[in-house]
Amino acid sequence: MERESGCAAAGETEAAAATAFRDATRQISNERGFENVELGVMGKKKKVPRRVIHFVSGETMEEYSTDEDEVDGLDKKDVLPTVDPTKLTWGPYLWFYMLRAATSTLSVCDFLGEKIASVLGISTPKYQYAIDEYYRMKKEEEEEEEENRMSEEAERQYQQNKLQADSIVQTDQPETVSSSFVNINFEMEEDCEAIKENKQRPVSVPP
């Protein structure tokens, strides 16, 4: 029992010492101008993407704004504060609506002009006709070169065929000449023998 009461008393003295130490540190920090901040796991704020890009393949890409973009946005908000036209006097009120009408008219004219130019084909580059002419001439030159190449190849093929035909005729011609020559000699020899026989045969004279 005494041991248990001693342990309880020791625990109480330790707790009292801890509270006294905590109070002392808090007092010192207050004197120095510090603030006590309780540390804990704070839930991180979920960052919302500025835009989501969808691709044809089905993939998506989220684009987040950087810190510089956020700072620029804050600067723009500071530079261009929202104006309540109901609180303006007549002069600034008319000036405000004149500027708003002018900017909206310019934006509408710009949009319509771009659409009309794209429909009429005015949005083509300034020297597009020269570019088209260059590509047309280049295409004609390529076609002409192709025709020349094909004609040269056909002419070469014709010359080769002609040379082959001439060589075949030259190899066949001497055989025909020699055979005809032999035949002519043979016929001439036969004719000569017939003439000799006629000459050697005695001619009978009638009485």
UniProtKB/Swiss-Prot annotation:
Residues 142-176 are annotated as: Disordered. The modification N-acetylmethionine is found at residue 1. Residues 157-176 have a biased composition (Polar residues). The modification Phosphoserine is found at residue 65. The keyword Transmembrane helix does not apply. Residues 131-170 form a coiled coil. Belongs to the FAM177 family. This is Protein FAM177A1. It comes from Mus musculus (Mouse). The gene is Fam177a1.
